[in-house]
Amino acid sequence: NPNWDECVTAFQKAVAIDGTNPVVLTYLGFSLNAKASLINKDRAAQKALYTEAMGHLERAKELDPNREKANWAYPLYQCYYLVYAANDPRTLEMEKLLKQQ
């Protein structure tokens, strides 16, 4: 299994060097998602990680809206689903986008 703390740290360093790379932003968001999914008892800590991931994934979406470089859509969908719930407009928008793939 990957060490998600190490992954997050490495991608944070990469984002500090170049915060406009949608691939790095997507991998950072994905790593934060994975780390959050391992938290079972602390819902606030889990939500904080999903929210942090969301920021990076939304930035990747801004930089690469057509997903030509990075596939940020599914991890962003996961964040929206787990933070805002299934019927939130943001979640539904990502779900629709994923079905168009």
Language-model regions, residue ranges each:
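TPR alpha-solenoid repeat register
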Residues: 24, 69-72
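Short coil/turn linking the two alpha-helices of tandem helical-hairpin repeats
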Residues: 1, 29, 34-44, 81-89
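Canonical positions in the second alpha-helix
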Residues: 13-14, 60
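Short coil turns that delineate tetratricopeptide repeat
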Residues: 19-20, 65-67
